[in-house]
């Protein structure tokens, strides 16, 4: 059985790491552009664009507009401030990207506790442990090969926190054998590693941008390859030449159980939600497990399904499921 975990920023936040875009922007506001010697003129232009960005963000916040709290959406819309100055945008993007990497690098040395490691290991070993008894029986009845769980992870984060957990949790071997006394069976768990769909800190640059051209508000920039190479994440991944897009799409296409943890399911990663939708519709036996953290909706009643219903609707909306597909 192929079990695929997609991990988002909610994972780092649950660890207590200040990795929200709002945390970074507070840091970025106080940084002086530093592109290197001989580029002082570009640095002055960047500073002006930065001031305009924060001014416009403040105005939108006063009007109660929530969309720009997502920095990637904000970047796509802020392109209108540059007119036809594509080089100016590329310099601005470079400065922000480098600053984001510098900021997150401060929190990239995470050492999990033994208790956290054991919990992580159990989560991978028993992917159905979060299901109710009825759902667990349904999973066991599915026509999957349950003698071996192949575990793959796709991280949407830049930090290596999830890899630190897995590296320690599966320190002795990438393959483990487990028995289920309750159900009189056993199986092997094979950990296959982590794919970083947006790049990894200290590994040749990170991807910060949008999913497709329509999310770039500046019409001229939609036709500009220099901008698209940076701002369009699928094109940026292609330029990096790592084949990570193809590898991750293949993992989704072959997954029997897809677990989504800490993901906002926002529009700037729409290609991945579309791929999950395709897998789900192509194979009705595929199971989607979505961990939606909403502490405001917690209830002491285990039959209060409001939180579950809202999470399900959020997933349905993100995948674009319609009618009977739901």
Question: How does the language model describe each region?
Answer:
Residues 302-326:
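Acidic, Ser/Thr-rich peripheral helices and adjacent loops at domain boundaries
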Residues 16, 209, 319-323:
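Glycine-centered secondary-structure boundary/capping sites
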Residues 2-6, 15, 19, 23, ...:
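Active-site periphery "cap/insert" segments of enzyme catalytic domains
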Residues 42, 46-47, 205-253, 303-312:
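Acidic, metal/cofactor-coordinating or nucleic-acid-engaging core segments within structured domains
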Residues 177-235, 259, 294:
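Long, well-ordered mid-to-C-terminal structural blocks that present hydrophobic/aromatic surfaces
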Residues 12:
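Conserved Rossmann-like nucleotide-cofactor binding loop
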């Amino acid at each position: 059985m192929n079990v695929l975990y997609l991990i988002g920023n909610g994972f780092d936040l649950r660890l207590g790491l200040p990795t929200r875009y709002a945390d970074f922007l507070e840091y970025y506001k106080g940084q002086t552009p530093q592109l290197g010697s001989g580029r002082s003129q570009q640095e002055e232009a960047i500073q002006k664009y930065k001031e305009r960005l924060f001014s416009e963000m403040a105005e939108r916040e006063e009007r109660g507009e929530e969309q720009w709290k997502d920095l990637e959406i904000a970047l796509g819309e802020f392109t209108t401030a540059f007119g036809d100055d594509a080089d100016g945008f590329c310099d601005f993007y470079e400065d922000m990207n480098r600053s984001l990497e510098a900021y997150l690098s401060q929190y990239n040395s995470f050492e999990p506790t033994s208790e956290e490691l054991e919990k992580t290991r159990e989560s991978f070993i028993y992917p159905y442990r979060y299901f109710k008894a009825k759902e667990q029986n349904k999973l066991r009845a599915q026509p999957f090969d349950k003698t071996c769980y192949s575990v793959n992870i796709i991280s949407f984060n830049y930090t290596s926190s999830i890899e630190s957990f897995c590296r320690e949790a599966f320190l002795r071997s990438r393959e483990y054998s487990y028995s289920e006394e309750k159900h009189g069976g056993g199986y092997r768990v094979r950990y296959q590693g982590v794919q970083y769909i947006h790049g990894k800190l200290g590994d040749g640059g990170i991807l910060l941008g949008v999913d497709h051209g329509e999310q770039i508000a500046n019409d001229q920039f939609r036709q500009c390859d220099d901008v698209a190479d940076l701002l369009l994440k699928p094109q940026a991944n292609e330029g990096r030449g790592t084949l990570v897009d193809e590898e991750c799409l293949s993992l989704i296409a072959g997954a029997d159980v897809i677990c989504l943890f800490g993901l906002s399911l926002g529009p700037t990663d729409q290609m991945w939600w579309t791929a999950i939708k395709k897998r789900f519709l192509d194979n009705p036996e595929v199971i989607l497990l979505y961990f939606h953290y909403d502490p405001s909706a917690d209830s002491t009643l285990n039959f209060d399904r409001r939180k579950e219903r809202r999470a399900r609707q959020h997933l349905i909306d993100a995948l674009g499921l319609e009618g009977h597909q739901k």
